[in-house]
Amino acid sequence: MSYYIAPRFLDKLAVHITKNFLNLPGVRVPLILGIHGRKGEGKTFQCELAFEKMGVEVTLISGGELESPDAGDPARLIRLRYRETAELIKVRGKMCVLMINDLDAGAGRFDEGTQYTVNTQLVNATLMNIADNPTDVQLPGSYDSTPLRRVPIIVTGNDFSTLYAPLIRDGRMEKFYWEPHRDEKVGIVGGIFAEDGLSQRDVEKLVDSFPNQSIDFFSALRSRIYDEQIRDFIHQVGYENVSLRVVNSLEGPPAFKKPDFTLSHLIESANFMVAEQKRIETSQLVDEYNRLNRGRSYQPASPVAEIATSQPSPNGVNQPQSASPHISLETQEQIRQILAQGHKITFEHVDNRRFRTGSWQSCGTIHVDAESDAISTLESCLAEYRGEYVRLVGIDPKAKRRVVETIIQRPNGTN
């Protein structure tokens, strides 16, 4: 099957890899290329196609390997794979790269529900150290004075804002946001259906019918078209015999004729897939479960502005007071707007020294999704960390990314 490589993607990858193998006098080349973007847009697959076209060998690390029960193992793994790749360049005499898939999933911090471990710190520190000293990468407990070959590092992820800020600065990591435009998407989808007799016009209509869907959606659509034939095959041999027929049969694997890949059939199947997506989006069961776990009923909270507390005054007369006297109206309005959009809220603090490195820490332990909880949590945070920076963070629970970061208190106590 002839898959399509987007020229823009290929150029970016080829330039970064080649530049790291050249000796450019007086030029400091970033070692890491960070490819980020929406889920399912083919970042990893486009990398694989580009590597194959360029004849580049790849050493892979998964984001799931960046955590371990033993502190230091993931950092050691990165150093070991880097040294192995440098040795491959030397032995085979060809370009080789180290690729880390889903770096943000393994080393990022999405919210206070994501634990920040020793391994997370060590992974970030190790990548920073390698980016600064690419020819001097040592294993813990040993030292080799022989300089290594420089190994370009390619990392992929969805949201690099969750990573440690010094790691992604321009001198260490070059960023490339991958969101294929229509022509690129038509080319990629055309490659997916290249063997199925779909015309260029049909591919364009299919893409235009589902403009908000990722590349992975169309790949899954092609797989779904085979479901009808597989269902007929299962009915033909029987549920009780399908295991022996497929796995342990002298007849060989079953053969299937080419399914119906007409545009109308594709759009019909795609609509079923979109309907399943919408059911998940509208169910919001996780919100209900979280509310039950916190002992709250599944009902929207009343606006804070309508809540008043009565405290006895010195003369014995009860006077109503605002629920949040020292939180500005602008901050309260921003909280309402974030929650109205279906987002979650959390608060973070940092002292003056750690502010320069971006080492923020959470003020609470849960997502806040009700205005009354947000106000009370913020009041507690401001009171407890009076001499520090405090910021409000809005989180999109569907995309698992931050949409708002606003500093609402500074060390001098101003809001």
From Swiss-Prot:
It comes from Anabaena sp. (strain CA / ATCC 33047). One of its GO terms (molecular function) is ATP binding. Keywords: ATP-binding, Nucleotide-binding. The gene is rca. ATP binds at G37, R38, K39, G40, E41, G42, K43, T44. Activation of RuBisCO (ribulose-1,5-bisohosphate carboxylase/oxygenase; EC 4.1.1.39) involves the ATP-dependent carboxylation of the epsilon-amino group of lysine leading to a carbamate structure. The keyword Cell wall biogenesis/degradation does not apply. Induction: Transcribed in light but much less in the dark in both normal air and 1% CO(2); the nitrogen source has no effect on transcription. Constitutively expressed when grown on fructose. Transcribed separately from rbcL-rbcX-rbcS. It holds the Pfam family AAA. This is Ribulose bisphosphate carboxylase/oxygenase activase. SMART domains: RuBisCO_small. It comes from the Bacteria. Transmembrane segments: none annotated. Belongs to the RuBisCO activase family. CDD domains: RuBisCO_small_like (cd00307). InterPro entries: ATPase_AAA_core, P-loop_NTPase, RCA-like, RuBisCO_activase_AAA_helical, RuBisCO_ssu_dom, RuBisCO_ssu_sf.
